[in-house]
From Swiss-Prot:
GO terms for molecular function: succinate dehydrogenase activity. It is found in: Cell inner membrane. InterPro entries: Fumarate_red_D, SQR/QFR_C/D. The chain crosses the membrane at residues 26-46, 55-75, 99-119. It comes from the Bacteria. The keyword Transmembrane helix applies. Two distinct, membrane-bound, FAD-containing enzymes are responsible for the catalysis of fumarate and succinate interconversion; fumarate reductase is used in anaerobic growth, and succinate dehydrogenase is used in aerobic growth. Anchors the catalytic components of the fumarate reductase complex to the cell inner membrane, binds quinones. Belongs to the FrdD family. This is Fumarate reductase subunit D. Coiled coil: none annotated. Disulfide bonds: none annotated. It comes from Shigella boydii serotype 18 (strain CDC 3083-94 / BS512).
């Protein structure tokens, strides 16, 4: 018999953010680390492609703000979700662990949003 009042879970939302953050961390973050962390300091990047003025102009544009927001927030959600489930797997039960980890991720998301808007 089908339960007429099924219990709804909030877990799909967190798994979605975890998956998006993991994908972003695997595809976009290594490219940014290569470009900004290795090629640029070694002088292997062409000309003024990443000059201060160009990077600032990009960061202040709408698409730049969205990119910076996603670059910070998605890996953050992925990491905190992973920490929450790692603690559970190791049988370390944090009181109200879901509220601690996901609440911290939500607070840091709001802080990031405020920071990105004020650039």
């Amino acid at each position: 018999m089908i339960n007429p009042n099924p219990k709804h879970s909030d877990e799909p939302v967190f798994w979605g953010l975890f998956g998006a953050g993991g994908m972003w961390s695997a595809i976009i973050a290594p490219v940014m680390i290569l470009l900004v962390g290795i090629l640029l300091p070694l002088g292997l990047f062409p000309g003024d492609a990443l000059s201060y003025e160009r990077v600032l102009a990009f960061a202040q544009s709408f698409i730049g703000r969205v990119f910076l927001f996603l670059m910070i927030v998605l890996p953050l959600w992925c990491g905190l979700h992973r920490m929450h489930h790692a603690m559970h797997d190791l049988k370390i039960h944090v009181p109200a662990g879901k509220w601690v980890f996901y609440g911290l991720a939500a607070i840091l998301t709001v802080v990031t949003l405020i920071g990105i808007v004020t650039i």
